[in-house]
């Protein structure tokens, strides 16, 4: 009889371990280990690093027998004392082993007392063929159980709750479920409403790192500047977004929300929002059809029509233009966060089709110089490490695009010892890259030699099938821009190429000659699909979004035309000032004479609109 003791999580990474019953004479010379030592070599089920099992602490190891410490003391039949396995395996002239009739062993002490020894099974560790054992597994695997068996899902590791609250074996689409929150409402669609408690913990943790939004809640307790606002949102649904949504609710707004990315939703957070009464329609792993269905459920509601739009990527705005253009008669404005969405707004404006004012949050100072730079500088490493476990030192990396996102990625990888190349179309950004110590190249020049390719452009087909064909074996390909169009993933879905899902959000695309590339998040946004982002930095962006909504909603008629605007400089400075107390920072104040000399108001704004930070 053989018993497999390797956990499912470790099965794909280490050879299978097979334990066989052996006779005492066979076990002693082949193993010679105590039970504690054997236990230390076997990976624990469901946790730990299966490739590097830690030895038992010294305090837990059985002491090695020495002079004067024979097995007599260890095997004495004292009440409540369990003999040590290492001592039991040694023979001693003062003790004799006797067989019981039922096959058990007895210990005979010098005074003739017979004590039944605890029964043990001698085990020999043998290594089975990994490939053979893995192939014995059932071929039908749940949608996410394979990723769990290979590695703890990186994308579900935002919280400890995710690992034991996710319904990984439940193949039922959330659209087919009948769920209600504790108040009896069913106006939502999430993965599992029972995850709400764990999502609430995530939100409460995020609140501690989002001081400006919490300050807005306190300052607006009486006036409710968004009273009457009906906001429809399409953003990443994370704990940070939940804090923003609840802040908007505290300011008087009604909200309905969908996700702007099919992989970035935190299921437990979506459940917590639904439990709190927010109509949320999102879950991790939506299909393309699910994505548009969720957006439509937010917009197409009997007896409820939005008058404000908060978008990230422009998909929500596009859907309303396409399906419900008459809604814009009551919509006061659009707030757009991403470079992709802003680009689409400018296209509408240029074509004369933008029928409401729009606020460009992406190009505000507080978004560009903080979220785009500092957020990406930290999260690029987090996303790559969680999905690939790779070492960055000495790796050759090409970063496509040297805007604020590209700058953050390059700085992080350079600091970790990577050799970084940059591609860029803008001579100003290109010169910045050169002055920062990066070599400016065309992608074709380095595509055969680099270990990692990262896109940060907001453009389409930056990495084409030709580039993918020329990449070296095991090259990692990922995207830090908003859209999934930067990498031509569609060109890889052909019969001659094999796709192999090796862990959550990690695919190996295999060529006929055996070459493979490692594609992360199917070309979608790496950091929000595969890891997480710094909450404090997102607090800056979320506060900017909230103030932009307040500004557009309360602006007198005629202040904003049917065009795209930047947030007023005074509001940028206000957002920054709300975050300074976290660092115990103290601003210097201008004297009247200094303010007059500079031609400034003592309370700001301190820079003209044309100033580049």
UniProtKB/Swiss-Prot annotation:
Its subcellular locations are: Cytoplasm; Microsome
Q: A single Pfam family, by name?
A: AdoHcyase
Q: Region LISN domain, inhibits interaction with ITPR1: which residues?
A: 2-111
Q: What is its EC number?
A: 3.13.2.1
Q: How is the cofactor bound?
A: Binds 1 NAD(+) per subunit.
Q: What is its main location?
A: cytoplasm
Stretches with biased composition (Pro residues): 52-68
Q: Per UniProt, where does substrate bind? A: 238, 312, 337, 367, 371
List cellular component terms (GO).
cytosol; endoplasmic reticulum; intracellular membrane-bounded organelle; neuron projection
Residue ranges annotated as compositionally biased, kind Low complexity, are: 1-14, 35-44, 70-80, 147-166
Residues that the record marks as modified (N-acetylserine) are: 2
Q: In which pathway does it act?
A: Amino-acid biosynthesis; L-homocysteine biosynthesis; L-homocysteine from S-adenosyl-L-homocysteine: step 1/1
Which pairs of positions does the record mark as disulfide bonds? none
Residues recorded with modification Phosphoserine: 109, 151, 154, 157, 160
Which positions does UniProt annotate for NAD(+) binding?
A: 338-340, 372, 403-408, 424, 459, 480-482, 527
Renumbered residue ranges of the record's region Disordered: 1-186
Q: How is it modified after translation?
A: Phosphorylated during neuronal differentiation at the LISN domain.
Highest taxon of the lineage: Eukaryota
Mind listing the GO molecular function terms for this protein?
adenosylhomocysteinase activity
Quote the tissue specificity entry: Highly expressed in cerebrum, cerebellum and kidney. Also expressed in thymus, spleen, testis, ovary and, at lower, levels in lung and liver (at protein level). In cerebellum, expressed in interneurons.
Q: What reaction(s) does this enzyme catalyze?
A: S-adenosyl-L-homocysteine + H2O = L-homocysteine + adenosine
Entry-linked InterPro entries? Adenosylhomocyst_ase-like_sf, Adenosylhomocysteinase-like, Ado_hCys_hydrolase_NAD-bd, NAD(P)-bd_dom_sf, S-Ado-L-homoCys_hydrolase_CS
Q: Which NCBIfam families match?
A: ahcY (TIGR00936), PRK05476.2-3 (NF004005)
Function of the protein: May regulate the electrogenic sodium/bicarbonate cotransporter SLC4A4 activity and Mg(2+)-sensitivity. On the contrary of its homolog AHCYL1, does not regulate ITPR1 sensitivity to inositol 1,4,5-trisphosphate.
Instruction: State the oligomer form and interacting partners.
Output: Homotetramer. Forms heteromultimers with AHCYL1 (via the C-terminal region). Interacts with ITPR1; with lower affinity than AHCYL1 and maybe via ITPR1. Interacts with SLC4A4. Interacts with ZCCHC4.
This one is known as Putative adenosylhomocysteinase 3
What organism is listed for this UniProt entry?
A: Mus musculus (Mouse)
Q: Which gene encodes it?
A: Ahcyl2
